[in-house]
Amino acid sequence: MSLYTTQSTQVSFEMHSALEKFNEHRNTLKMTTGSADLDSLIDGIQEGIFYLFYGNHYTILEAIMYRFLINCVLPAKQKHGFESMGVCFNNVDYYYHDAAKKSSAISPEKIGVAAKCAGIDPKIVFKNLYIHPACNEQHQLLVAEQVADLITSNKDIKLLVVNRITKFFKESKNKMETANILKQVIGIISKACAKNKVALVCTGDANTTARGIIPRPIGGIYLKHAANVIVHIREFSKTSAIPSFKATLIKHQYTKTPKSTILYVRKTGGMVLLD
């Protein structure tokens, strides 16, 4: 449905038949998450849709990030990928000398390991990925504008992964100012992705101080309303050497929520991958 407003403030609506919407959905490109259970929960990753995966266990969110970046490049028919280019918008403290904080930078070694596990030459993946780091909230806003321009100018891009989108909001002492910047960032990238049919995947933090069985995502109401699909992920079992995680679908366009599944990971080449 398109909305147009004339100078006389009259509003007209362009109506679409159910068949048109069905054909549009049927022809929509869809990428696997790399997990049959997660695919079943959210119906894969579709172009033009905004996904938010959030929680406080960074291991699983990082595993999702690397898996999605690789899957974007995979062939569409044989491997259920987008067979296209992807962008990683990484929010990280690059100017710290703390090794633990440096480890949150995107690792070429981990991309290589994940690519080999997916059965694709790492060189092909490297050629089809853009990585844009942001080191503070002001830089985050600048990078958002650059990424939006890149998506608009390069029609081969079908996936944007924003790693730790709420990082600077979580760590900020001036929540009001940072919340406003975060809102601008979300608005810029979500509009660019929707307009150009690019899948938008964000990872974020959970608000552990909030009441309720399932914590809300950090970032305010705007983030919650902007995302089309929202999944909360928490550690489920510590009984084995490799933990499992519970993914709970909080919001979806056409699936009843809440709905949950268990995700498994595997350790390989010094990293954890979604299984």
Regions picked out by a protein language model, each given a short descriptive name:
Residues 2-124:
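The Walker A/P-loop phosphate-binding site
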Residues 48, 126-129, 226-228:
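Short, well-ordered alpha-helix to beta-strand connector turns
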Residues 52, 159-163, 201:
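Structural motif
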Residues 56, 90-93, 165, 205-206, ...:
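Short, ordered loop/turn segments at secondary-structure junctions
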Residues 68, 72, 181-195:
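Catalytic-core regions built around general acid/base machinery
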Residues 83-172:
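Conserved inter-motif catalytic segment of the P-loop NTP-binding fold
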Residues 164-186:
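Conserved P-loop NTPase nucleotide-binding/switch module
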Residues 187, 191-275:
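Phosphate-binding/switch region of NTP-binding enzymes
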